[in-house]
C-alpha cells in the first residue's frame, strides 16, 4: 500500500493512513510489528492524519469532503464530519479540542472535538491550493502554504496528468490564529 502520514500516540504505537487501500494501520514501534489493519469504509484516499492522544482518537482526512474520527483501540469509525474538498493535512489542538484539515479548495475546516458529536464548526477561507499545513501547539497557529500556478500542460502518454508550473515569486505562507 501507499503510506501517507504517520501519527504517534506517545505510548509506543504508530498509526498511518494507507491511502490507496482506504485503511489505517497500527504499528508497535518497539517490536516493529503490525498490530492492526482497519478498513475505513467511509473514508476514501485518506491523506493527512492527526491524533488526540488523551482520548485515543485519530483524524484522517479523506476525499469526498469528509474527516473520519477513528478509535485508536478498536479502529471503529465514530463520526464523519464534513470538511472542504481536496484535503491534504490534518491537525489537532489538544488545548482547545479542535481537529482541522487544510483543503485544496482554499479552506481550513475546523471540527469541535470536545464532545462526542465531532461537528464541523467553521470553514476558514485561505487560498486555492493551500493544502500543506503545520500546526504549532505552543502558539495555536496554523500555517498553510500555496503559490500561484501557470496553465496546465497538455497531457501526453508519458505524463497523462501533468501539473502546472508554479509562477515565480508567488509562494506564500498564510498564518491562521484564533
Where do the protein language model's features map onto the residues?
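Predominantly soluble domains enriched in secretory-pathway, periplasmic, or organellar proteins
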Residues: 1-178
Amino acid at each position: 500500500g501507499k503510506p501517507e502520514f504517520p501519527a504517534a500516540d506517545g505510548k509506543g504505537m504508530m498509526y498511518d493512513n494507507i491511502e490507496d487501500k482506504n485503511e489505517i494501520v497500527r504499528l508497535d514501534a518497539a517490536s516493529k510489528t503490525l498490530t492492526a489493519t482497519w478498513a475505513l469504509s467511509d473514508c476514501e484516499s485518506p491523506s493527512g492524519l492527526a491524533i488526540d492522544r488523551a482520548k485515543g482518537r485519530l483524524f484522517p482526512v479523506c476525499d469526498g469532503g469528509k474527516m473520519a474520527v477513528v478509535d485508536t483501540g478498536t479502529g471503529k469509525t465514530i463520526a464523519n464530519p464534513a470538511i472542504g474538498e481536496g484535503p491534504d493535512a490534518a491537525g489537532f489542538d489538544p488545548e482547545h479540542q479542535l481537529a482541522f484539515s487544510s483543503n485544496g479548495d482554499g479552506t481550513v475546516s475546523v471540527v469541535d472535538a470536545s464532545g462526542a458529536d465531532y461537528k464541523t464548526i467553521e470553514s476558514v477561507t485561505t487560498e486555492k491550493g493551500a493544502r500543506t499545513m503545520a500546526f504549532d501547539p505552543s502558539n495555536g497557529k496554523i500555517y498553510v502554504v500555496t503559490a500561484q500556478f501557470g496553465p496546465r500542460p497538455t497531457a501526453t502518454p508519458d505524463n497523462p496528468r501533468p501539473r502546472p508550473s508554479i509562477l515565480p515569486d508567488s509562494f506564500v505562507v498564510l498564518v491562521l490564529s484564533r
